[in-house]
Amino acid sequence: MYRQLFPTPEVAAWRRAQDRARAVPRFTPGSIRLLDYELQYSDLLSLCPQWHDIFIDGALEYRADSAAPRILDCGGNVGLASLFFKRRFPSARITAYEADPAIYKMLRANLDANGAGDVESVHAALWTENGRVRFLAEGSDSGTIEVRSNGIDERTVDVPSLRLRDLIANDPNGRINLLKLDIEGAEDAVLADCEPVLDQIDAIVMDLHEFDPLVRQAPRVLELLTRNGFTYAVDEFVPQPWRPPVAPGTAPFPGKALLWSMTVRAWRA
């Protein structure tokens, strides 16, 4: 009751955003002030849970051994994660990657407008090779590389792709202290390709997405982490019943989502 009557500033900001989101059509770009952040967004309804996860639930809280950790923000969206990391570690060396061309512009604008102009940003999808890929830009935080398409009929665009393995191997800092990975279903393929360089990573926080009910990637990803010396914890299971699956499938359990995501945190013990 006390927290309802006297919410933290972060909760009060989230409630205000939620109230506005109810009155705004989906996928309507705009801007909003939350705490001392001036934020552009592509879809306010998807910004709200991001804010709650990061600034209220502490989904990206991380204890670094250095005051200036090296962080890769893979799937930066409009920049909330990078802004959080920059507030937590003002001297952090952060690179944020975002594939959606329209959202990337918002990411860059939000970094520049909120005291994080030294965060490097790159417009690219993280993948298993350098080049170009087709990307389903659905207008919020669920865009995905076309080979991982789950049947959402949205605008498809051609975007540059970068091989994450090469970025890790050639990083001028030598080690990646934290890899934040939110690449909407490409986790298995990308991490498998990165296996030869995983010893250069200290910790990982990722959203692991299951879009194909016939081919689950979680067992392979978790086994890969164990094989490469990581301890992991899994939580924040989120059903995604609104998504059509990559492959058709039915389950004998009515009302249970075939598609879901979960958060995996991995570290070296």
Across the structure, where does each feature detected by a protein language model lie?
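Phosphate/nucleotide-binding beta-alpha loop and adjacent structural elements of enzyme active sites
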Residues: 1-269
